[in-house]
Amino acid sequence: MGKQTNISIEVALDENKIPEKIVWSAPDGGVNEQEAQALLMSLWDGKNQETLRMDLWVKDMPIDQMNVFFHQSLVTMSQTFLRATKDE
């Protein structure tokens, strides 16, 4: 196996286990303790042929920002799918 790297996500929770703060780092990508308000993560389990997901957002994220976040995420997913498969 070649070089390995780490991407880390730290989530601060309130007393009810609701996210209050999300911080992520990807040192090889030049990201160090960058704060974020939301994340949508999907991982493919090829053995079981299913998607594993983790969707998080901080409790004080405004709905208008959530709308923009989802719109941009869906557009990006569409572009990534087209680039990866050439399937329109």
Where are the model-predicted features located?
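Active-site- and interface-proximal helix/loop "cap" or "latch" segments in soluble metabolic
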Residues: Q4, E20-K86
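Structured beta-strand/loop patches that form or line metal/cofactor-binding pockets in enzymes
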Residues: M1-I9
